[in-house]
Design a protein with these regions (language model features):
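Hydrophobic alpha-helical segments and helix pairs
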Residues: 220-262
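C-terminal motif of bacterial Sec signal peptides marking the signal peptidase cleavage site
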Residues: 63-66
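Acidic, serine/threonine-rich low-complexity disordered tracts
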Residues: 68-213, 286, 290-405
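N-terminal acidic, proline/glycine-rich, low-complexity intrinsically disordered segments
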Residues: 1-9, 69-71
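Bacterial N-terminal signal peptides that target proteins for export
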Residues: 5-16, 24, 36-55
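Short, structured beta-strand/loop micro-motifs enriched in basic residues and often containing a Trp
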Residues: 264-273
Length: 405
């Protein structure tokens, strides 16, 4: 359990002034712990971006020089360990000891009702305090950068490509927030959702012979190391409508660095598209949008649209669509070898397109969806007026939920 006593606040760049003020009241040790974790994440993100840009520019040079060599063959390794079924209590069992929990403040989203639907209308909200849940979650991600000649440019987002899937069998409960100080972002939230990951595993890992050493990745090793993240604690402080105020993370003391990074990234992706309900009654066919900011290979502005397809007691079925656009309007190649292939060191966003589909079943007495899947791929194209080619970035996400039996 992530308790208030084991909580350390880590400020995020987008936090409000009050949150920054709250952070300033934390102890030096909490600030140091949070700073260390942010530094580690920033280092990993920076390294990932450097490798990605280097890979992109290498591809650019080959394309612009009309070289058609194919990439080295890839090896794929997966951990075949299956998710263990059982109740929330059985899953939690004797979990490994975790480090001090870190809290990441989340920006408040903007919710807009597009239609209240037809027939009988109902105010939808979570009523899950004191409940327990066991659910299997699959978080799949893919990212690709390539260069296309402008006369062959395709701006439409493709279907899902190669994905790395992290499977997270989780179990937990919902509590009334207690023991958090006023300096904790979201301390006055209505709900404290508290989960543990049990028996995580990963599949779909691919590394080429040319990039594996630079990336510091070993497919077989990571598939084995992910087991060290067993018992990873996570949760959030949230409102009854589903709005998340603070993400809570507590890595097991035994977890390896790569295992921590993989699970952290998957959990961050998980909370990037929460089911948030509007503050007015809705019926069948109702639609509302949620605007938020999400991070990943690049920071994106995201609009998630929910459509009610059925309401039966506490169960709500939703169709979901996602649209994304980059928060930054340009990509800088300055200082990178291979940038001479472009007419300018700065490439502007020329188009953005998202292909998405999804449907989720939500039990309002449970904090996570009990069934369903959400898939989306966003293609962002960067270019300039005088260039012969454009940089294309594709980022894909798939999330699946199924209740444990």
């Amino acid at each position: 359990m992530i308790s208030a006593a084991a909580f350390s606040h880590s400020a995020s760049r987008g936090s409000t002034g009050s949150r920054r003020s709250a952070n300033s009241r934390h102890s030096a040790s909490s600030r140091h712990s949070a700073h260390s974790r942010r530094a580690a994440r920033s280092w990993r993100d920076a390294k990932s971006r450097r490798l990605a840009v280097a890979s992109l520019l290498t591809t650019s040079a080959l394309l612009l020089a009309a070289c058609g060599d194919e990439s080295p063959a890839s090896d794929e390794t997966s951990n075949s360990a299956g998710a263990s079924a059982g109740s929330a209590g059985e899953r939690r069992g004797e979990a490994p000891a975790t480090e001090q929990a870190v809290g990441l403040p989340l920006d408040a989203p903007r919710i807009q009702v597009l239609s209240t639907g037809t027939g009988e209308r109902k105010l939808l909200s979570y009523n899950d305090v004191s409940s327990e849940q066991a659910v299997d979650i699959e978080v799949s991600e893919g990212f690709q950068q390539l260069v296309m000649k402008n006369d062959q440019l395709v701006t439409e987002a493709p279907e899902l490509g190669d994905l790395v899937t992290t499977t997270l069998p989780v179990a937990g409960s919902v509590l009334v927030p207690e023991g958090f100080t006023d300096s904790t972002p979201g301390a006055d939230s209505a709900r404290h959702v508290d989960f543990r990951v049990r028996d995580p595993h990963i599949s779909g890992i691919k590394t080429s012979t040319s990039s594996a050493d630079d990336a510091g990745l070993n497919a077989a090793g990571l598939a084995e190391e992910i087991a060290s993240a067993d018992g990873f604690g996570f949760g959030w402080l949230a409102e009854n409508n589903g709005q998340l105020n603070t993400l809570l993370l507590a890595a097991p003391q035994q977890a390896g660095d790569q295992a921590r990074a993989v699970v952290e990234q998957s959990l961050t992706k998980l909370v990037s598209t929460p089911v948030i309900f509007p503050d007015e009654p809705v019926g069948i066919g109702a639609q509302w949008s949620v605007d938020s900011r999400v991070t990943g290979e690049a920071t994106m502005l995201q609009t998630t649209t929910f459509t009610v397809t059925d309401i039966s007691g506490d169960e709500v079925k939703l169709d979901i669509s996602v649209e994304q656009r980059p928060a930054l309007g340009a990509l800088s190649l300055e200082g990178h070898a291979g940038a001479e292939g472009f007419a300018d060191d700065t490439l502007n966003v020329t188009s953005t397109d998202t292909r998405s589909r999804g449907s989720l079943t939500v039990d309002m007495k449970q904090p996570l969806p009990v069934a369903g899947e959400l898939d989306f791929t966003t293609r962002v194209v960067y270019g300039n007026d005088d260039g012969a080619a454009s940089v294309v970035q594709d980022s894909s996400t798939r999330m699946r939920f199924s209740s444990a039996q």
